[in-house]
Amino acid sequence: MQARDLADVAIDEDPRAPCLWVPSELWAEFCAAIDQRPNRIGAVIYRNKTVRDGGPLTDVTTRRP
């Protein structure tokens, strides 16, 4: 699965969560897939969620790592 697919699954599983964290290893791939660059605080908006870099060796999750 691609980073964007993993993010879609996480969002679908927890649609009320305001944020999503993506592992550092997948961050560049995810940003390229949605054709966005992080803003000044390092977040992007995808499907009305604030998406951030979750750090190395983490999962794609809606809960803060």
Predicted regions and their residues:
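N-terminal acidic leader/helix
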Residues: 2-17, 56
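Extended oligomerization regions of viral-like shell subunits
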Residues: 16-65
